A protein has these predicted regions:
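Nucleotide/phosphate-binding loop and acidic/charged catalytic motifs
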Residues: 21-27
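A structural motif corresponding to the C-terminal end of an alpha-helix
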Residues: 47-54
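Short, conserved phosphate-binding/catalytic loop or strand-edge motifs used
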Residues: 27-28, 62
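Active-site core segments that coordinate phosphate-bearing ligands/cofactors
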Residues: 1-19, 31-42, 46-47, 64, ...
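Gly/charged, well-structured mid-domain segments that form the phosphate/adenylate-handling core
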Residues: 57-64
Length: 281
């Protein structure tokens, strides 16, 4: 019996292998993995009673076999890494912020770095991806929309399109000079689950919308600051995910927080696209 991820299992079945193999970018997600050495920590595994043979064998090869149609089958790779491969064209000079239901900051490094608040994940083909994920992320904006909906209902009004109403207010009113500080930590942080969201003064819908967007951008910018403090270099800012693609005002908040123009990635479904690009090379 061997453990593997669903991606490894599908790849194994496609090319008729009897046992699965795993890329380091996928293996790291199983735990007990030394990202710098790109191997499972067998000492730790044995120390807790797990036979290292229970885990799949690591492969450095891009292709692991051939399917019935004679097409080559690539090893499955990590979804974060796949999304980065699709969204970022120049990994040495670009970094990525993604806002969907959650949010994430990712930046490539040719050397293995340890950065507080960021995970060091192996990249397919070499190098590492430093990644930080907010627990709430893009859902903070959804919580704000739900707050406005509940407030309208409390006042006896129906609001079926809160996002359209919020966008209309942003378009018509402009950005106030006294936007409040908002911490959108409604589910805590990965370091402290007891931290919760908070706001300062200037409590109007317009101020709160801008404050929430600024807070979402600030949370990922803190990860970038930790990366720079650890010796990382400045890079061009790339954005992906529906949260950014569908909200130019949120893009402006990220540009303001990072003090950099943000460029949206070319396509959608970045993780699926990145996996295809990896297999096509």
């Amino acid at each position: 019996v061997t453990l593997c991820t669903i991606g490894d299992y599908i790849a194994m079945k496609l090319c008729g292998r009897q046992t699965p193999v795993i890329d380091a970018s996928n293996a790291a997600g199983l735990g007990f993995f030394d990202a710098e050495k790109r191997t499972f920590n067998q000492t730790v595994l044995r120390g807790i009673g797990i036979d290292p043979a229970f885990l799949p064998g690591l492969t450095e090869d891009r292709f692991i076999g051939i399917c019935r149609s004679r097409a080559r089958v690539a090893a499955a790779i990590g979804d974060n890494q796949a999304g980065f491969l699709s969204a970022v064209r120049d990994r040495e000079h670009e970094m990525l912020v993604n806002v969907g239901t959650g949010s994430q900051f990712s930046v490539f490094s040719s050397r293995c770095m340890t950065v507080p608040g960021l995970e060091t994940r192996p990249m397919p083909g070499g190098g590492w991806l430093l990644a930080g994920a907010a627990l709430c992320g893009g859902r903070a904006y959804a919580l704000l929309a739900d707050f406005f909906t509940q407030t309208a209902r409390m006042m006896g009004m129906d609001m079926n399109a809160p996002y359209a109403a919020m966008e209309g207010l942003l378009k018509s009113a402009g950005r106030p000079e006294d936007v409040p500080t908002v911490l959108p930590l409604f589910e805590g942080t990965r370091q402290d689950s007891m931290q919760t969201g908070s706001t300062a003064e200037n409590f109007t819908p317009l101020h709160l919308i801008y404050g929430m967007m600024d807070g979402m951008a600030h949370e990922l910018h803190q990860m970038y600051q930790a990366y720079r403090a650890a010796g990382g270099t400045a890079k061009k800012l790339i954005g992906s995910g529906g949260g950014l693609r569908n909200n130019r005002f949120l893009c402006e908040s990220f540009s303001r927080a990072f003090d950099s123009e943000i460029t949206l990635s070319d396509g959608r479904e970045e993780a699926a696209c990145g996996a295809a690009l990896y297999a096509a090379d």
